[in-house]
């Protein structure tokens, strides 16, 4: 049987994007209907302004360990932040930078190439601190900076809010191109996240970009509907040129968006429509003040 820590960790790592907003703003309204789910989510992703330990009352309601369980969940928070490409604000700065396995240093430190900064991250509170100057040491530094410039233009053109990064990986034989865009709309009961990770080999005779595009959306008004997609991507580029590489990536993301749109239309007109209950057409007005006394099989159908 799984331990309390293992169960709590699995909830944390599987939490939908932005659900801390639901947990705090909608907690009273949904407390009875979704109490276990909301409580777990409330401790898994936190608003920028309040530490996760402020949700200790929720933890106490779910586990006998109460807030004492938080330290044992640190690995789960770290995995979540790196996998979901969580963004943090650098101290004294307005821009957000992302956290991933590709820009990780020793301990809980990460680096951002564009701002030339390394920083420490508290994975529980999702806050950055101890920022220091950082100089990228890579034989592909010029390519990385060129990719960042083109990626910045792509992000500005196609995403309302977006964080991105380009990092040397695999002993400097390849670079990782990483992008994340979040849209949170708790007042309309939905939150979403777009993630894209691409690997570009730089010391290969054939230049093929491989990667994945992931879209996660959660809709929770009077229900609980989630969209989780994972699209493998393989792109051939004629040369290791930053402009052409980002152009191919932009085309792949646009094509996938159109593919998702077609899938939504097909699902709405097919599967979802088939789920609706088909009621008989009687061409008779319904007397709503008497609806509580109707015998559905007879009165509505006009029978006696």
Q: What does each model-identified segment do?
A:
Residues 1-108:
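Alpha-helical protein-protein interaction scaffolds
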Residues 9, 23, 31-32, 142-149, ...:
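Polar/charged alpha-helical tracts
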Residues 13, 32, 36-39, 75, ...:
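Extended, non-membrane alpha-helical segments enriched in charged/polar residues
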Residues 30, 80, 102, 110, ...:
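Sequence-level detector for tyrosine residue identity
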Residues 52, 61, 75, 79, ...:
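C-terminal/domain-edge helix-coil "capping" segments
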Residues 65-66, 70-159, 195:
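Long amphipathic alpha-helical scaffold segments
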Residues 125, 129, 195-196, 242, ...:
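A generic structural signal for ordered alpha-helices
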Residues 145, 149, 153, 157, ...:
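Surface-exposed short loop/turn segments
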């Amino acid at each position: 049987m799984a331990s309390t820590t293992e169960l709590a960790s699995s909830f944390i790592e599987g939490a939908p994007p932005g659900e801390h907003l639901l947990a705090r703003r909608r907690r009273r309204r949904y407390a009875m209907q979704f109490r276990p789910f909301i409580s777990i989510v409330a401790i898994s992703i936190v608003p920028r302004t309040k530490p996760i330990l402020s949700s200790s009352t929720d933890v106490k309601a779910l586990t006998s360990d109460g807030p004492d369980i938080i330290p044992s969940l640190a690995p789960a928070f770290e995995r979540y932040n790196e996998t979901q490409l969580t963004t943090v604000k650098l101290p004294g700065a307005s821009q957000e930078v992302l956290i991933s396995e590709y820009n990780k240093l020793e301990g809980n430190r990460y680096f951002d190439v564009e701002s030339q900064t390394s920083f420490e991250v508290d994975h529980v509170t999702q806050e950055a601190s101890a920022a220091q100057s950082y100089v990228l040491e890579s034989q592909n530094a010029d390519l990385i900076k060129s990719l960042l410039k083109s990626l910045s233009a792509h992000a500005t053109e196609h995403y309302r809010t977006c964080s991105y990064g380009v990092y040397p990986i695999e002993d400097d034989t390849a670079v990782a191109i990483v992008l994340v865009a979040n849209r949170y709309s708790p007042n309309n009961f939905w939150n979403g996240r777009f993630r894209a990770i691409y690997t570009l080999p730089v010391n290969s005779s054939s230049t093929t970009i491989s990667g994945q595009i992931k879209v996660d959306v959660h809709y929770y008004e009077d229900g609980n509907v989630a969209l989780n997609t994972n699209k493998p991507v393989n792109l051939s580029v004629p040369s290791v040129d930053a402009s052409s590489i980002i152009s191919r990536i932009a085309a792949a993301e646009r094509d996938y968006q159109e593919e998702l749109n077609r899938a939504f239309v097909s699902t709405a007109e097919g599967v979802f429509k088939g789920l609706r209950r088909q009621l008989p057409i009687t061409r008779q007005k319904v007397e709503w003040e008497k609806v509580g006394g109707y015998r559905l099989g007879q009165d509505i159908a006009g029978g006696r």
